[in-house]
A protein has these predicted regions:
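Catalytic phosphate/metal-binding cores of nucleic-acid and nucleotide-processing enzymes, i.e., regions
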Residues: 1-79
């Protein structure tokens, strides 16, 4: 399964549970996580990776930057 297909599958499941899924496609910040999820005043970010995928140094930096602002960032690997 491609990383994109895995991301879509996961997002459909989240949407079925009431989460609003926002795909970050036109961001001016490179390395920003793939999606943002919102529900009942809760927010988290998700970066999706294929089985062999790994985070770039810039992605690690952005994730740490977001976490330093007390937001949750999940890194979700395909099983």
């Amino acid at each position: 399964m491609t990383e994109s297909a895995f991301e879509q599958k996961w997002s459909h499941k989240a949407q079925a549970k009431g989460w609003l899924s926002i795909k970050n496609i036109q961001m001016s910040l490179n390395g920003w996580p793939d999606r943002m999820y919102l529900k009942d005043r809760m927010v988290f970010f998700a970066e999706f990776k294929s089985k062999k995928g790994k985070l770039s140094e810039l992605q690690k930096y952005r994730i740490n930057q977001i976490r330093s602002l007390n937001f949750h960032v999940l890194i979700i690997y395909e099983q």
